[in-house]
């Protein structure tokens, strides 16, 4: 396979008329059909509540998968799945065709022929960061809080992490913004040091 994305090694998949359950990857993804035909069903991340995802662990391939069989859904058991499919994008690819799957978009892949070849190019736009680790820390530190405290932290995350109201440090002079300022290697190193220090203290308890 050619080096379609600079610095990204392609991965080659050879198989039969198989199906890949609905899942998402924490990467950007370009999939190229080398042989056979494949049907891709893409669903935006906002549909997570309608997809009836399985556990985070254990998983068949390291990522969550939906409990719904897309080609034969049980709508009585999974009634919200119809709403997810209303937002779906579906593409059928022949050999030589390619599809871009955006970061964290859910997708189902169905190989339509008895012999199929697929080439994947996965890359992480921010390779030094791990939102998954942040989420795991949230499971430990936030999920068991009382509802009023979770609401308070949700407001904090919306403002300071997800920037729901714009730049939360815009009213401060640049030299006083601290972790609210521009993300630089030095700032990232400082925040990581704070995280490591906090984890070390908790592990000693």
Please place each PLM-identified region on the residue numbering.
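Internal glycine-rich, Lys/Arg-flanked active-site/core loops of soluble domains
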Residues: 1-18
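Double-stranded beta-helix
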Residues: 5, 17, 33-100, 105, ...
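A short beta-loop-beta micro-motif enriched in histidine and acidic residues
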Residues: 7, 19-29
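Conserved, well-structured core segments
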Residues: 12, 29-32
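A generic "binding-loop/recognition-motif" signal
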Residues: 18, 26, 105, 115
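Short glycine/proline-enriched turns and hinge-like loops at secondary-structure junctions
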Residues: 23-26, 33, 43, 111-113
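A short hydrophobic beta-strand segment most commonly corresponding to one strand
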Residues: 53, 113-129
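Conserved double-stranded beta-helix
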Residues: 90-93, 134-205
